[in-house]
């Protein structure tokens, strides 16, 4: 039996994370005691990123701006994901609302082939993957437009905060 067992825990809320970590500690400790280990197990928690939970009002405002600029045929809600993202650390620390969005950047043919074969999760590399390689254009232009449109949703004179 190995002397360590690294786990990667991803949850959708801090409350669920606490419940899961407490359960792991309880189960591992009980198993070690039942097996007669000479000492209690050690637990080391590192690289914790909190769940990213968009503020509804902020998201609605930015989404409306995206819909108006890009068209509703080019905007959609991202499905719930268990990605590790440190984006929310700063706004959570400052106590300010935020919204996190994504833009497409995968080669359309690569995406289509993966979707047709039912292999999106394995054939389309996500952010932070060593194989992640978005197409340069129109990804850069779309990302720049998205940032400007989101900023103008708050800063333009016709959109008072």
Regions found by a protein language model. Give the residues of each.
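Metal-dependent amide/peptide-bond hydrolase catalytic core
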Residues: 1-161
């Amino acid at each position: 039996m190995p002397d360590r067992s690294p786990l990667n825990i991803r949850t959708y809320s801090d409350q669920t994370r606490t419940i899961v970590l407490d359960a792991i500690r309880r189960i591992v400790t009980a198993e070690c005691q039942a097996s007669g280990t000479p000492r209690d197990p050690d637990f080391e928690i590192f690289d914790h990123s909190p769940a990213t939970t968009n503020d509804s009002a902020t998201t609605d405002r930015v989404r409306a701006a995206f819909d108006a600029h890009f068209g509703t045929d080019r905007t959609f809600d991202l499905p719930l994901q268990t990605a590790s993202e440190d984006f929310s650390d700063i706004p959570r620390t400052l106590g300010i609302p935020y919204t996190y969005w994504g833009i497409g950047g995968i080669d359309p043919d690569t995406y289509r082939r993966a979707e047709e074969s039912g292999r999106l999760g394995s054939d389309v590399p996500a952010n932070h993957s060593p194989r992640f390689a978005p197409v340069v254009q129109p990804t850069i232009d779309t990302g720049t437009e998205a940032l400007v449109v989101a900023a103008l949703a708050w800063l333009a004179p016709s959109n008072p905060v």
